From Swiss-Prot:
Disulfide bonds: none annotated. GO terms for cellular component: cytoplasm; TRAPPII protein complex. It comes from the Eukaryota. GO terms for biological process: endoplasmic reticulum to Golgi vesicle-mediated transport; vesicle coating; vesicle tethering. PANTHER family: TRAFFICKING PROTEIN PARTICLE COMPLEX SUBUNIT 13 (PTHR13134:SF3). This is Trafficking protein particle complex subunit 13. Part of the multisubunit TRAPP (transport protein particle) complex.
């Protein structure tokens, strides 16, 4: 009859402890009225308690610190630190001790050991200590694998390992929204506004040290999270930078294409990379966490084959007096165009000049500026409409209405600059 051999005990003992900051000790005050049976007994006990504050014994918060009593929570972006100790519990010398610590995630296995060299020998009641650090960059299940190999005095090679499983939680809920800016000319521009909503989903407050947007090479970014008062820059969130549990903050950024990219039509179209958010915070006793989002992408607005934008237009004009506007025509297609400009009058707007004139050939991603003259025969807020561009190659006409608005006043009213 086959009998399973007894499990062999190892000469070395492995201890693993997570290193975290201590917490403030809290005591529960127990008091009573002076006329009650205990009298001043409870008050005297609280005064003699070393964990209380002199003169404020009834407050729960003391001046003493306590070491962590459990593993606690680990959040994404924090640094996981652990103390590993291998102790020789036997009465003999152990040789060639190798301690290896690996962290297994859902996607990779990382070696966290500071040194992969074996220790020549370990005498009785001696130990080998190591401290490992790792910035957590994935959520979900993590397994710390600690393996120990050594050789006994009899030359027998021994090996054992232990597994420590823990969960990495998400500390912040980040949501982003993109808004396409509209200029004073009532036309969509290349500027983009990014709204980032950041919510603290942990159980403790956070100090938001930094929330910044790192733009891609195509954009320049302007933070809109502060105001200037009396020459001093003040945060829109006030002087306190704390984010309480389940509270949300909204950060706003304005992105504008760099000049070398904005002048090239067709580059900023379709799905474009905006950049990524870099968030740094601190929790109790200054423990720092950092989180970087993946590259944020947005769908750029489509302009069709030909884009018409206004470079200059007055806000207010006189009734029945000509005024000038400057248009910019951009070929957003990948082919050559031969354009003809037609100007169609409306009930209130009348174009001055020759309609049907040739603008010439326009290469892909090229632009041309065009000065036009028009007048209005009706007072009030009038919409500029009636421009038509025809590509003679494909016999295709592009219509542009409501491209801007002007305020038309009587000539007797002084127009302010």
């Amino acid at each position: 009859m086959e009998v399973n051999p007894p499990k062999q005990e190892h000469l070395l003992a492995l201890k693993v402890m997570r290193l975290t900051k201590p917490t403030l000790f809290t005591n529960i005050p127990v008091t009573c009225e002076e006329k009650d049976l205990p009298g001043d007994l409870f008050n005297q006990l609280m005064k003699d308690d070393p964990s209380t504050v002199n003169g404020a014994e009834i407050l729960m918060l003391g001046e003493m610190l306590t070491l962590p009593q459990n593993f606690g929570n680990i959040f994404l972006g924090e640094t996981f630190s652990s103390y590993i100790s291998v102790h020789n519990d036997s009465n003999q010398v152990v040789k060639d001790i190798l301690v290896k610590a690996d962290l297994q995630t859902s996607s990779q296995r990382l070696n966290l050991s500071a040194s992969n060299a074996a220790v020549a020998e370990l005498k009785p009641d001696c130990c080998i200590d190591d401290v490992i650090h790792h910035e957590v960059k994935e959520i979900g299940t993590h397994i710390l694998v600690c393996a120990v190999s050594y050789t006994t005095q009899g030359g027998e090679k021994m090996y054992f390992r232990k597994f420590f499983k823990f969960q990495v939680l998400k500390p912040l809920d980040v949501k982003t929204k993109f808004y396409n800016a509209e200029s004073d000319l009532s036309s969509v521009t290349d500027e983009v506004f990014l709204e980032a909503q950041i919510q603290n989903i942990t159980t403790s407050p956070m100090f938001m040290e930094k929330v910044s947007l790192e733009p891609s090479i195509m954009y320049n970014v302007t933070e809109l999270n502060s105001v200037t008062q009396a020459g001093e820059c003040i945060s829109t969130f006030g002087s306190r930078g704390y984010l309480q549990p389940m509270d949300t903050r909204q950060y706003l950024y304005c992105l504008k294409p760099k000049k070398e990219f904005a002048e090239k039509a067709g580059i900023i179209k379709g799905v474009t990379v905006i950049g990524k958010l870099d968030i740094v915070w601190k929790t109790n006793l200054g423990e720092r966490g950092r989180l970087q989002t993946s590259q944020l992408q947005r769908m750029a607005p489509g302009y069709g084959d030909v884009r018409l934008s206004l470079e200059a237009i007055p806000d207010t004009v006189n009734l029945e007096e000509p005024f000038h506007i400057t248009c910019k025509i951009t070929n957003c297609s990948e082919r050559m165009m031969d354009l003809v400009l037609e100007m169609c009058n409306t009930n209130s707007i009348h174009w001055c000049g020759i309609s049907g004139r040739q603008l010439g050939k326009l290469h892909p991603s090229s632009s041309l500026c065009l000065a036009l003259t028009l007048l209005s025969s009706v007072q009030g807020l009038q919409s500029v409409s009636g421009l038509r561009l025809t590509d003679t190659f494909l016999k295709r006409t592009y219509e542009y209405d409501d491209i801007a608005q002007v305020c038309v006043v009587s000539a007797a009213v002084e127009v302010e600059a």
